[in-house]
Design a protein with these regions (language model features):
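Short, glycine/acidic-rich hinge or "gate" loops at secondary-structure transitions
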Residues: 11-28
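Generic hydrophobic alpha-helical segments
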Residues: 8-9, 208
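Extended, solvent-exposed, turn-rich assembly/linker loops in the middle of proteins
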Residues: 31-113, 117
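Short, small-residue-biased leader/transition segments that mark boundaries at the very start
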Residues: 1-8
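Residue-level signal for secondary-structure boundary elements
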Residues: 10, 14, 69, 73-76, ...
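Sequence/fold signature of self-assembling virion shell proteins
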Residues: 96, 101-225
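Extracellular structured ligand-interaction cores
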Residues: 3, 76, 198
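Ser/Thr- (and often Asn-) enriched beta-sheet segments in non-cytosolic proteins
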Residues: 8, 31-35, 125
């Protein structure tokens, strides 16, 4: 399990940075935190909770787009959210009436139809991420929280940097140890012990994403006003 956790650690960090503006992870009895300095006014609640069919979802998204454009000169063109939030879109009165004009909002709304409408109306391409992972405590967590809607520009938002672990630098030359690099930057070290006789296994990784575009991202908590 430890190796699986290490293999997804960099992905967890990237999604934390994108959806919260910071990283907070636990490991080896320590808490690792890093704040990317995202402007506080680029993290906001909504005018009315989006679960309310009368919420002004389109206006909220336009407000966020205008804010990022005004502050940075960059247009946000992508968004990531959950199926829960897409369900709010599906029930939203304004969105339904805008799509089903001839039937006064009556009709079935698929995710594909909603995505196309938002793309045509606001030039925002929506991605749904409902993927989950098991954290260090064994609890199942989401990469993207249920009630989060994150807007960001096209292109590369940053990159992940990998460092050399102590096992790679110090133990690879020792006959008593066997170090293998798996996935990206994950060092799996096995060492034979004589007293008592056993094999000790360590799984280590050193990595940190950078996020130079943090000020070009807008995060909505859609369940709070």
């Amino acid at each position: 399990r430890r190796q699986r956790q290490m293999c997804i650690r960099d992905r967890r960090m990237r999604m934390m940075a994108l959806t919260t503006g910071a990283i907070a992870m636990e490991g080896n009895g320590q808490v690792y935190e890093y704040d990317y300095g995202m402007p506080e006014d680029h993290k906001s609640n909504v005018t009315k909770v989006w679960s309310d069919p009368s919420a002004s979802i389109l206006t909220d998204i336009r407000t966020a787009k205008d804010k990022i454009l005004e502050d940075t000169g960059v247009e946000v063109t992508r968004a990531v959210t959950s199926s829960t939030v897409m369900g709010y879109f599906r029930k939203n009165t304004e969105i339904k009436k805008s799509i089903f004009v001839l039937t006064d909002g009556e009709g079935f709304l698929s995710d594909a139809k909603i995505k196309q409408f938002i793309l045509d109306e606001l030039n925002i391409e929506i991605a749904i991420n409902d993927k989950k992972y098991v954290d260090e405590s064994g609890a199942v967590q989401r990469y993207v929280d249920d009630d989060v809607f994150v807007l960001f520009p096209s292109g590369n938002l940053g990159q992940t940097w990998f460092g050399t672990t102590p096992e790679e630098s110090d133990l690879m030359s020792l006959a008593a140890s066997n170090v293998k690099i798996t996935d990206t930057g994950v060092a799996v070290t096995t060492m034979a012990k004589e007293d008592p006789v056993n094999v000790e296994t360590k799984v280590t990784q050193i990595c940190l994403p950078d996020f130079p575009t943090a000020d070009q991202v807008f995060i909505y908590s859609v369940d709070q006003v």
